[in-house]
């Protein structure tokens, strides 16, 4: 299985999809590496009802309603704007020569830092409708400068335009897609119930998915690392982001999967790799070091 993954990577046909658990590889200075750790920081900054203290999206919504959206942004920024270095795995991924698309389904900027070694790349981040009404995605150059989105004339119906890509972004050789937003460069966060409702209302018809992502994913295989698929949000985002890709994928999923995870893996034709993220990364990078095609970059 490792050989198949490396072969797909060597052909430029693999899309790494990273979840929060990958941050455990970055050491003690890393930002929150789970929804549970993040909601603990949110509820330490603002009082929320006991029954939702462990629910990230509900706690964020309560704070947004009874404090202000700016409070959410401030707490999220404080949680993720930490002086953490990319892990060796982040750096290893960023050094792959054929890397058309990476997905980071969390709010950190470690992949951005690792990608600084590359040329001709950029960032697409999901954006909250409460802060960027009518715009699903914010685009950024490696220096953090924002690229204006495609202008559209709204017809007054309230319908939101699709996430068309500015011409400049279609020429990048590598795109980092952060569907939930990210702390850097723009402090975009899809985190509250209302944030998710806006996206999920449209995601089945792909409106919030960046145009470049829809194009690049065709015929590609996804490799999920540091992700779980236990709840509907996790499954919905993964399902819609990988739509119309190839019919072969992999997921590093240690431990006993839930019934919902088992169904999702079968539905999406995702082969489960039952090992820890640490062990998988060690095998993957060791396999690359032993591959004639990848030896020079391992």
Language-model segment annotations:
Residues 1-298:
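SIR2/sirtuin NAD+-dependent deacylase catalytic core
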């Amino acid at each position: 299985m490792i050989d198949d993954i490396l072969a797909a990577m060597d052909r430029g046909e693999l899309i790494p999809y990273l979840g929060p658990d990958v941050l455990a590889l970055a050491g003690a200075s890393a930002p929150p590496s789970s929804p549970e750790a993040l909601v603990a920081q949110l509820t330490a900054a603002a009082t929320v009802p006991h029954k939702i203290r462990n629910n990230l999206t509900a706690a964020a919504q309560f704070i947004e309603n009874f404090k202000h959206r700016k409070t959410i942004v401030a707490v999220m920024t404080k949680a993720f704007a930490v002086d953490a270095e990319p892990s060796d795995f982040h750096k290893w991924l960023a050094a792959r020569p054929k890397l058309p698309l990476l997905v980071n389904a969390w709010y950190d900027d470690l992949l951005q830092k690792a990608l600084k070694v590359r040329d001709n790349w950029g960032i697409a981040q999901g954006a909250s409708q409460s802060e960027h009404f009518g715009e699903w995605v914010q685009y950024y150059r490696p220096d953090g400068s924002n690229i204006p989105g495609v202008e559209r004339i709204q017809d007054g119906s309230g319908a939101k335009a699709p996430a068309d890509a500015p011409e400049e972004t279609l020429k990048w050789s590598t795109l980092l897609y952060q569907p939930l937003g990210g702390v850097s460069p723009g402090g975009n966060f899809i985190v509250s119930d209302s944030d998710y409702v806006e996206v999920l209302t449209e995601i089945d018809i792909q409106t919030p998915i960046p145009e470049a992502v829809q194009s690049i994913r065709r015929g590609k295989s996804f490799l999920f690392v540091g992700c779980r698929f236990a709840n509907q949000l996790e499954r919905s985002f993964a399902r819609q982001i990988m739509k119309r890709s190839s019919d072969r994928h992999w997921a590093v999923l240690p431990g006993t999967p839930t019934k919902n995870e088992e169904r999702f893996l079968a539905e999406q034709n995702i082969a489960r790799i039952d090992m820890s993220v640490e062990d998988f990364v060690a095998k993957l990078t060791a396999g690359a070091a032993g591959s004639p095609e990848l030896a020079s970059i391992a």
